[in-house]
Amino acid sequence: ARFLRSKHARTSIRAAKGRPADASTCRRPRGSMAAMRSLSIHELELMANTIRQDIIKALVRAGSGHSAGPLGMADVFTALYFHVLHIDPKRPDLPERDRLVLSNAHICPVLYATLARRGFCSVEAFHATLRAFGSPFQGHSNTHFGIGIETCGGPLGQGISQAVGMALAARLDRARWRTYCLMGDGELNEGQCWEAFLCAAKEKVHA
């Protein structure tokens, strides 16, 4: 499992400080994966702001939902989905794709907005149907609509266990894809998180 304190997530920190990201630490060749032009720091910043605008539009239309967490994480999601993750919007179930687990799934508006801008789903549909009955854009993320979401969210503390399990599965399969987990600080009160951390350290899935 790769955590946000890793060298990959520091891409967004470099962007904030105006330093170029080291693409060699974030990109690796993957023959069957769709290639995407690397965005400049300025383009990443513009995309993050566009995602923030999408979040506000959808939340205002819905009349409810979390705003602070999604807005604050826009830079991180932009760095991951537009610079780090090896994914293909045309084939969201591709076996060799990287996985991202969103444990604190109540901040899912930023995930939806980012997936929409990355081409997994419609931006307009996200604006119009967030938290509506039958919409793929519910108050907590779920996997049932095939738009690039890896896990169902809701109970806090479960995401890191799921991510560690995915990372172990990749090792057993000798697969090259990587697992990333985003979680909130409040989740750390759950004992399940610490069991997952201990397992990750013992099995060295962080390396």
Show the residue positions of the predicted features.
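N-terminal hydrophobic or amphipathic helices/low-complexity stretches enriched
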Residues: 34-51
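N-terminal capping segment at the start of a domain
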Residues: 48-64
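Cofactor-binding active-site loop characterized by glycine-rich and histidine/acidic residues
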Residues: 55-58, 70-202
